């Protein structure tokens, strides 16, 4: 099967794209509701409908990306989210402060946006490691998906980046992975003015074969 683009909006995005045993969802929001709790409930209800429409399972969610207007409010979302997902098969993922676009046909008060990567081939095993409410890493079809890691024990961005990468060294050894095989690395930093501090530890870690990725202020 080739790439399938479904529910394509004119001049916009596909609602979901299927490719290589994966489904990639566009981020969904629910600004018609006022509170973060109500928006989270509305988004997850919509995903229930979409999973049914496209024949997907919550137990096959591999990775979650959540952008929140204020990630300090994460607990309000997390309580609802962890009741919604399959508790035996939690995904990896990240939740960061990132201001979602503030206009839509149904309202301008967008407090969060949520997207998923979902496995589509039930014959392929999904392995989840270090499972608590979420999980540290998910392995599926030859790919590993890591939850975002932080290192707040030190003060500067450069020191924190070095600490995070050192932690990944430990995790790669634990899970039998190689940093040379990292395909994409996304970084979310508090202040883009300090972007230059990333280069030294990042280059020292990856050398001549760095991954693709993005660094954004979030």
Regions from the language model: what does each represent?
Residues 1-63, 67-166, 170-183, 188-218:
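N-terminal presequence-like segments and the immediate start of the first folded domain
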């Amino acid at each position: 099967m080739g790439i399938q683009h479904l529910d394509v909006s004119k001049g916009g995005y596909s609602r979901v794209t299927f490719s290589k045993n994966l489904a990639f969802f566009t981020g969904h929001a629910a600004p018609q509701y006022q509170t973060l709790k109500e928006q989270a409930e509305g988004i997850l209800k919509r995903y229930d409908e979409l999973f049914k429409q496209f024949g997907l399972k919550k137990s096959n969610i591999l990775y979650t990306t959540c952008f929140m207007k204020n990630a300090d409010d994460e607990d309000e979302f997390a309580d609802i989210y962890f009741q919604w997902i399959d508790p035996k098969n939690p995904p990896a993922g990240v939740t960061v402060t990132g201001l979602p676009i503030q206009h839509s046909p149904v309202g301008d008060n967008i407090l969060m946006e949520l997207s998923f990567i979902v496995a589509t081939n039930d014959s392929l095993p999904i392995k989840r490691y270090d499972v608590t409410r979420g999980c540290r890493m998910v392995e599926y079809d030859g790919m590993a998906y890591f939850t975002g890691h932080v290192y707040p024990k030190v003060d500067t961005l450069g020191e924190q980046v070095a600490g995070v990468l050192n932690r990944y060294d430990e995790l790669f050894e634990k899970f039998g992975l190689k940093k040379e095989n990292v395909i994409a690395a996304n970084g979310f930093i508090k202040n883009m003015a300090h972007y230059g501090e990333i280069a030294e530890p990042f280059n020292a870690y990856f050398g001549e074969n760095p991954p693709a990725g993005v660094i954004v202020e979030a």
